[in-house]
Design a protein with these regions (language model features):
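Extended, subdomain-level signal for the structured scaffold at the beginning of enzyme domains
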Residues: 1-96
Length: 96
């Protein structure tokens, strides 16, 4: 993918993720973007399909692992859902 100039943060969303754990950092970037419009935050999931969070909210990713979006940092939020992600080989492969 074509590289943009500003800092890009990929935020991982997965089944049973805690909303606050990915929405808060995403929100901070949206506020910071007012000062630096080149900052970018986006959601990345294992596949390009809706993801249901722990609270039942359905979230749509901007990218999938297959897209391999260009980013400077990749945030994996915490919460109960992370237990299942420790064995996600596609996630491990994506991080490398």
């Amino acid at each position: 993918m074509k590289r943009t100039r500003g800092f890009r943060l990929g935020v991982y969303i997965f089944k049973d993720a805690e909303i606050i754990d990915y929405a808060a950092p995403y929100g901070v970037f949206s506020v910071a973007r007012r000062l630096d419009p080149e900052l970018d935050a986006f959601l990345v999931a294992d596949a390009m399909k809706p993801v249901q969070t722990q609270a039942g909210l359905t979230v749509h990713p901007n990218y999938s692992f297959n897209d391999q979006p260009d980013m400077d940092a990749f945030l994996i939020p915490g919460g109960f859902g992370t237990r299942q992600e420790t064995n996600n080989k596609r996630l491990h492969q994506f991080i490398r």
